[in-house]
Amino acid sequence: MARVTVEDCLIHENSRFRLVLAASKRARQLTLGHQPLVAPENDKPTVLALREIEEGKVTVQGLLDGQDVSEHLARQA
């Protein structure tokens, strides 16, 4: 898969600053051992986080509100 960029994710969030904050929070979670919600494909945590946001697996608002990813998944089910 081609690398995802911040610009690719701006359809989910208008503020580049909020998007980068959310992606960095998710990347930190992945670094600490949380399971990725997309296939890793040898990507670094920051790229995985952006891919998860771009694919709608996690939301910027949810990450910034401090919601655990498992809470987000439970509400989607």
Curated annotation (Swiss-Prot):
It holds the Pfam family RNA_pol_Rpb6. It comes from the Bacteria. GO terms for molecular function: DNA binding; DNA-directed RNA polymerase activity. It is an enzyme of class 2 (transferase). Keywords: DNA-directed RNA polymerase, Nucleotidyltransferase, Transcription, Transferase. The keyword Cell inner membrane does not apply. The keyword Signal does not apply. GO terms for cellular component: DNA-directed RNA polymerase complex. The RNAP catalytic core consists of 2 alpha, 1 beta, 1 beta' and 1 omega subunit. When a sigma factor is associated with the core the holoenzyme is formed, which can initiate transcription. Promotes RNA polymerase assembly. Latches the N- and C-terminal regions of the beta' subunit thereby facilitating its interaction with the beta and alpha subunits. Belongs to the RNA polymerase subunit omega family. This is DNA-directed RNA polymerase subunit omega. The lineage of its organism: Bacteria, Pseudomonadati, Pseudomonadota, Gammaproteobacteria, Cardiobacteriales.
